[in-house]
UniProtKB/Swiss-Prot annotation:
Disulfide bonds join C37-C77, C73-C129, C118-C138. GO terms for biological process: response to pheromone; social behavior. Homodimer. One of its GO terms (molecular function) is pheromone binding. It comes from Solenopsis pusillignis (Fire ant). Residues 1-19 form the signal peptide. It is found in: Secreted. Coiled coil: none annotated. It holds the Pfam family PBP_GOBP. GO terms for cellular component: extracellular space. It comes from the Eukaryota. Keywords: Behavior, Disulfide bond, Pheromone response, Pheromone-binding, Secreted, Signal, Transport. The keyword Ubl conjugation does not apply. This is Pheromone-binding protein Gp-9.
């Protein structure tokens, strides 16, 4: 079974780096633990935000706080099931290692810098669900910016 590595981070890189971006796709929907985490948190796929919503920040204005929190709990569930998070704590080194392994990113790569910045920005947050969604949103937004700037070049 394929390891569910850096769930949303890897998905963000693949989704935004590929020519066939699918902004309507639900965040995390391609991973094995997605359905399990939805069930554990009483959500359906329709309740989960799309990549486009999250990368643009629209999820913050288009949804109630309860929806934001529940989506964050699904993200945290997937991260925790893969050993990338325990409660509200990241395993930063494992995240970086898995990220580099999965993406082939090299030291100095802007994608790694974005991941590090997003982890730093959210590391002191105590609510595991909110922390997870904000981390995912940060990485997706950074990926969108990096993809747009590389397309413009």
């Amino acid at each position: 079974m394929k390891t569910f590595v850096l769930h949303i981070f890897i998905f963000a890189l693949v989704a935004f780096a590929s020519a066939s971006r699918d902004s309507a796709k639900k965040i995390g929907s391609q991973y094995d633990n997605f359905e399990t985490c939805l069930t554990e948190h009483g959500l359906t796929e329709d309740d989960v935000f799309s990549i486009g919503e999250v990368s643009s920040g629209q999820h913050k204005t288009n949804h109630e706080d309860t929806e934001l929190h529940k989506n964050g709990c699904v993200m945290q569930c997937m991260l925790e099931k893969d050993g990338l998070m325990s409660g509200a704590d990241y395993d930063e080194e494992k995240m970086r290692e898995d990220y580099i392994k999965e993406t082939g990113a090299q030291p100095g790569d802007q994608r790694i810098e974005a991941l590090n910045a997003c982890m730093q920005e959210t590391k002191d947050m105590e609510d595991k669900c909110d922390k997870s969604l904000i981390l995912v949103a940060c990485v997706l937004a950074a990926e969108a910016i990096l993809a747009d700037s590389s397309e413009a070049a």
